[in-house]
Amino acid sequence: MKNKLVVVTGVPGVGGTTITQKAMEKLSEEGINYKMVNFGTVMFEVAQEENLVEDRDQMRKLDPDTQKRIQKLAGRKIAEMVKESPVVVDTHSTIKTPKGYLPGLPVWVLNELNPDIIIVVETSGDEILIRRLNDETRNRDLETTAGIEEHQIMNRAAAMTYGVLTGATVKIIQNKNNLLDYAVEELISVLR
């Protein structure tokens, strides 16, 4: 049986990384071992291997054609990992920029990854705003709940588009305050 490639997405502050890490720990206890990778980290590693950057901040300064090439190579590198074990890719469905929403998984990346499942982690805009305000470890842009909810709508639309292009299923998981265990269990049931 082919190893799964699962993409987990969500707006900053929704808790996608936390849910995924906890699910990985529990699955590991059952002998189910996914490799978890962050798409941006793999891109950075590829750019470093090519001596294009020394630190992660230099990534966004690369010209667009180079960035596309690095994205494609990162997708290919992750697809190679799936030959060895199932993989969960932690990334963003869309990235909110001053000029609009940028697809987190453009078609040249999707063609390389060919995911089996796309997970969209969500909760209310109010909950995300409060989490962001309480997170002193990150320097996030201040955003209204309406802006956060718009971003989540765009994530859903993008995720369904990714599903249409690849045949991947799309699963939405709610990560409500004080109900983390439910979200973790829901992710585990998808990953089994």
Curated annotation (Swiss-Prot):
One of its GO terms (molecular function) is ATP binding. Transmembrane segments: none annotated. InterPro entries: Adenylate_kinase_AdkA, P-loop_NTPase. It comes from the Archaea. One of its GO terms (cellular component) is cytoplasm. Keywords: ATP-binding, Cytoplasm, Kinase, Nucleotide-binding, Transferase. SUPFAM superfamilies: P-loop containing nucleoside triphosphate hydrolases (SSF52540). Active from 60 to 80 degrees Celsius. Monomer. This is Adenylate kinase.
